[in-house]
Amino acid sequence: MSGLEQLTDQEKKILERVNRKMRVAPITFREASAYIDHLHRHHRATIGCKFCISVLGDDGDIHGVAVCGRPVSRRLDDGFTLEVNRVCSDGTRNVCSMLYGACCRIAKEMGYRKVITYTLVSEDGASLKASNFICEGEAGGTHWTGKRNRGQEIPAEMKKRWVKNL
């Protein structure tokens, strides 16, 4: 009896997810928004974007998406800074790191000098660290203040700003 035959069904499913070959591919804003609305833990899709990308498995299934756009903070919107507004995955290993890395490569090709993104203070930022982002510390507030953003169900928690100079 081989070692694989002794694995439980759950362990086999985990192994299948780890061993998949994945690739980055473009995705429409509409498709990315639908994915985010379905799977994101605490945010809805964004209003607009500069570009969207996805990570596809060798079976063609979407395992994660990223939406990039202008910085939400007017103070940081200098024309050379791109913000990764949303990253969402189905939990497949390394997908978020792949998305952040691809976003940075694309941003550099487009002429951006810096990429920023935010996480909740309660999130550890492991995929950002793996993609060589640096935590600048706490930023923003616990809720949106603009009229346009009222009523969004966003956790009342401080954010951490992460930056990567290109």
Model feature map: region roles:
Residues 1-3:
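Basic, glycine-rich
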